């Protein structure tokens, strides 16, 4: 089976938990976009493990693959590999030599660019991801393959300084070069042709799971530009981000929260002007710790994401959190400047007048003390109001919700 897990909102949907749950059935798990701006948390028997570069499925899959579509901070990757080795024996990692390298210069540039944007700040994670992708498309990148040569590292850093030095200020090139070279010497055993590895695995009949980072609404082309990430996040970017043919993908799983959250600026039609959901769901970014904006489930966004990713099944997370509210709403459509929209439109002018049409549902209450009973009995034992909510979403999206998450832990999951 060749599967892709993608986020259908603004990231933070719970892809990490779903991927970790699924990965016992897969031989390889692959990251194909983003960098350490993607934070995901896996909870196993109450123990939290947080990754930013290593895919969430690493705890169960045989081989971890980091594709060419990523930009990688070698020092932070080393830290995560050490963390992974403490949690798991016999790890196997393949890192594409074509992946770009995130350096200290990129982090400095990221912060400086945000300062220069002033009131139009995007709200980046300040991890250097955007500037690293800028260099990729400007053909200036240090590649993972380059980390075995101190000369190549220095030459490319000097080139970056020559072109962008006014923004970075003084940087100790020797120190940065030596840090990258040292990290590279430890990582080089893992660096190779990830595309060829995946081709070989496919021909051997291995099961491969591609794990997307961020979400559809943060895609550089299809998201709420300019308040987006710097890479393509939709399922189709599996091919360009890993070198694996998308025609071989059999299964696209769209993951979404039972409500909507967003970090940073930009349009958010169903946003709620209270802290109730944030507090109930502990909605703070894994990478930055920033409070997430919260709102009701947005069906126009989910319809748009389902179409973009061609999802064939869905996974819903945090239903246990949503039930703690006294009343629950779902945004079913928009009226924008007098025109009706059931799907998120190609463009929304920031000055437009937006009205959201809502469907209201009765709560199913706080189920925290009853979750273990539901897990043992299956979908039909879930509260009636919760099942009504799930089935309304299925009917609205014309797609089955096969995976239902009722908590952070891997075990707190029901498969229909």
Curated annotation (Swiss-Prot):
One of its GO terms (biological process) is IMP metabolic process. GTP binds at residues 11-17, 39-41, 292, 318-320, 405-407. Binds 1 Mg(2+) ion per subunit. IMP binds at residues 12-15, 37-40, 125, 139, 214, 229, 290. It is found in: Cytoplasm. PROSITE patterns: ADENYLOSUCCIN_SYN_1, ADENYLOSUCCIN_SYN_2. Mg(2+) binds at residues 12, 39. InterPro entries: Adenylosuccin_syn_GTP-bd, Adenylosuccin_syn_Lys_AS, Adenylosuccinate_synth_dom1, Adenylosuccinate_synth_dom2, Adenylosuccinate_synth_dom3, Adenylosuccinate_synthetase, P-loop_NTPase. The keyword Cytoplasm applies. Pathway: Purine metabolism; AMP biosynthesis via de novo pathway; AMP from IMP: step 1/2. The active site is at 12 (proton acceptor), 40 (proton donor). Its EC number is 6.3.4.4. SMART domains: Adenylsucc_synt. Its cofactor is Mg(2+). GO terms for molecular function: adenylosuccinate synthase activity; GTP binding; magnesium ion binding. GO terms for cellular component: cytoplasm. SUPFAM superfamilies: P-loop containing nucleoside triphosphate hydrolases (SSF52540). It comes from the Archaea. It holds the Pfam family Adenylsucc_synt. Belongs to the adenylosuccinate synthetase family. Plays an important role in the de novo pathway of purine nucleotide biosynthesis. Catalyzes the first committed step in the biosynthesis of AMP from IMP. Homodimer. This is Adenylosuccinate synthetase. It comes from Picrophilus torridus (strain ATCC 700027 / DSM 9790 / JCM 10055 / NBRC 100828 / KAW 2/3). The lineage of its organism: Archaea, Methanobacteriati, Thermoplasmatota, Thermoplasmata, Thermoplasmatales. The gene is purA.
